[in-house]
């Protein structure tokens, strides 16, 4: 590629302009590397967050959550039906209560009150299970949404890193070409100059 001659070779036309371009490129090399390193940091952070979210999703089975919500809803409906039923019994026995009420009547009232308390507790427990399952479902959807957003952000940053890497490589290649031989760009054939300048988008 070189037409280096003994002594001082003849500098080709356009050499001075190319030297100016090489100086500008040399000045961009270090900043390009800094930008590249800065872009890699948030990309690495996003990669870690994506992995964490993927693990979280793996631990949250959407089908299982839906089944839990369905079962808890049915349990809650049954529990409240029993609460209503036993409440009617308690109210009825209390309305019929007399000072000389027979023993079986008093015992029936106590049983109805006990059943009512148990049904109420079960209804509260079912309500808690339902609320917990619904919260897990919301968390699951939120994780999925975050994963989608992070995926888009990661793609953008990844493209930025690729662009910056290419820019840095172009800087390095240009600097390498400038250092080619004792006189650098001055000793390259014109056809070679056009080829590598076009490759580096420097024309």
Swiss-Prot record:
This is Gramillins biosynthetic cluster protein FGSG_00038. It comes from Gibberella zeae (strain ATCC MYA-4620 / CBS 123657 / FGSC 9075 / NRRL 31084 / PH-1). Pathway: Mycotoxin biosynthesis. It comes from the Eukaryota. Part of the gene cluster that mediates the biosynthesis of gramillins A and B, bicyclic lipopeptides that induce cell death in maize leaves but not in wheat leaves. The nonribosomal peptide synthetase GRA1 incorporates respectively a glutamic adic (Glu), a leucine (Leu), a serine (Ser), a hydroxyglutamine (HOGln), a 2-amino decanoic acid, and 2 cysteins (CysB and CysA). The biosynthesis of 2-amino decanoic acid incorporated in gramillins could be initiated by a fatty acid synthase composed of the alpha and beta subunits FGSG_00036 and FGSG_11656. Keywords: Virulence.
